[in-house]
Curated annotation (Swiss-Prot):
NDH-1 is composed of 14 different subunits. Subunits NuoB, C, D, E, F, and G constitute the peripheral sector of the complex. Keywords: Cell inner membrane, Cell membrane, Membrane, NAD, Quinone, Translocase, Transport, Ubiquinone. The gene is nuoC. This is NADH-quinone oxidoreductase subunit C. It comes from Herminiimonas arsenicoxydans. The keyword Plastid does not apply.
């Protein structure tokens, strides 16, 4: 671990205290996990604390952990992952917060702390169904208003639920149930030891 990362780790532990659930270092990056009830206050500390000063929200996205890793995931299903940048100190941190309810995932909105979170949170809502409490305009951003479900959830069917087509009799685009038969895709398994090595 570099001196810079050691300083960042120490500053994070001191500033966040009990709000910090875990801190891991991998591939030269620090990832912290905070509880959903502490999310807003922890993010405000990350932005305002003099030893941290994470002024920029670089990215925010939703994650569905239902089939993460080699088997079934045993923790909460949905998380929001944010990437923050401190211009003052020239360091970065990844913040992960898990929604406490898998059926109705809700976390606090970051739009009051970083206005740039607006469209990121709308995208996470649109694709994963994660609700952001306090967001003043939480609506779909990339799928159409009649879209059913959230397409980045791992239990969403690959073919979707409805398809659009132009109806010449009605002279407009209409929705109809998907006409594709669902099937299970089996990954190709290559058993030859030296396959593709020649």
């Amino acid at each position: 671990m570099t001196i810079k990362l050691e300083l960042l780790e120490s500053a994070l532990r001191n500033a966040l205290g009990d709000q910090l659930q875990s801190l891991t270092l991998a591939l030269g990056e620090i990832t912290i996990v905070v509880n959903s009830r502490d999310y807003a206050s922890a993010m405000r500390v990350l932005r305002d604390h003099a030893d941290l000063r994470f002024e920029e929200l670089i990215d925010l996205c939703g994650v569905d952990y239902s089939t993460y890793g080699d088997g079934a995931w045993d923790g909460q299903r949905f998380a929001v992952v944010s990437h923050l940048l401190s211009i003052t100190h020239n360091w970065r941190v990844r913040v992960r917060v898990f929604a406490s309810d898998d059926e109705m995932p809700v976390v606090a909105s970051m739009t009051e702390i970083w206005p740039a979170a607006n469209w990121y949170e709308r995208e996470a809502f649109d694709f994963f169904g994660i609700l952001f409490e306090g967001h003043n305009d939480l609506r779909r951003i990339l799928t159409d208003y009649g879209f059913i479900g959230h397409p980045f959830r791992k239990d969403f069917p690959v073919s979707g639920y409805v398809e659009m087509r132009y109806d010449p009799e009605q002279k407009r685009v209409i929705y109809q149930p998907v006409t594709i038969d669902p099937r299970e895709n089996v990954p190709r398994v290559i058993r030859e030891e030296q396959y593709g090595m020649k």
